[in-house]
Amino acid sequence: QLTIEENLHIAMRATGKPNPEAKNDVYDLFPALYALRRTRANTLSPDDQYQLALANALVNRPHLLILDEPLHGAGHSVAQKLVQLLGRLNRELGMTVLLAEQQLSFIRRVADRFCLLYRGRNVAQGHVNELDDELIAHWMSREAKR
């Protein structure tokens, strides 16, 4: 039954060296959360809960952010914000984002490089411009034949 503010405070303390400015940085990234900062997290909309989860991950300014299927369960508006956010994290904060994702349109909008895994093996990698439908179809057809 914690508020947004309390959630962020706990996340900040997890590193043992809380930085008060970091919370303001998170509120800059997620202005809607600032407006709701005294609201209990369990009463938030799914989109706001999603933003709070991202804010908790970012409040300690990690050098590397790992996201596994970040669009899963996200509404359209959050997906649009996520595209902008990931670009901003990399461009302005120099943060590296490692992304596991199946939606090619999203990958093409946010990634610089890709690594295609098939059954746990790296089968292709390169600049995201090299990620084409033929390459995907080749590996998807192999999976269908299994």
Task: List the predicted regions and their residue ranges.
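ABC-type ATPase nucleotide-binding domains, specifically the catalytic core motifs of the NBD
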Residues: 2-21, 30-31, 126, 142-143
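Catalytic Walker B motif of ABC-type/P-loop ATPase nucleotide-binding domains
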Residues: 65-69
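H-loop/switch region of ABC-family ATPase nucleotide-binding domains
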Residues: 101-102
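A short, surface-exposed alpha-helical micro-motif characterized by mixed small hydrophobic
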Residues: 107-109
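Conserved catalytic motifs of ABC-family nucleotide-binding domains
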Residues: 61
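ABC ATPase C-loop
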Residues: 57-58
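Helical segment within the ABC ATPase nucleotide-binding domain
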Residues: 80-92
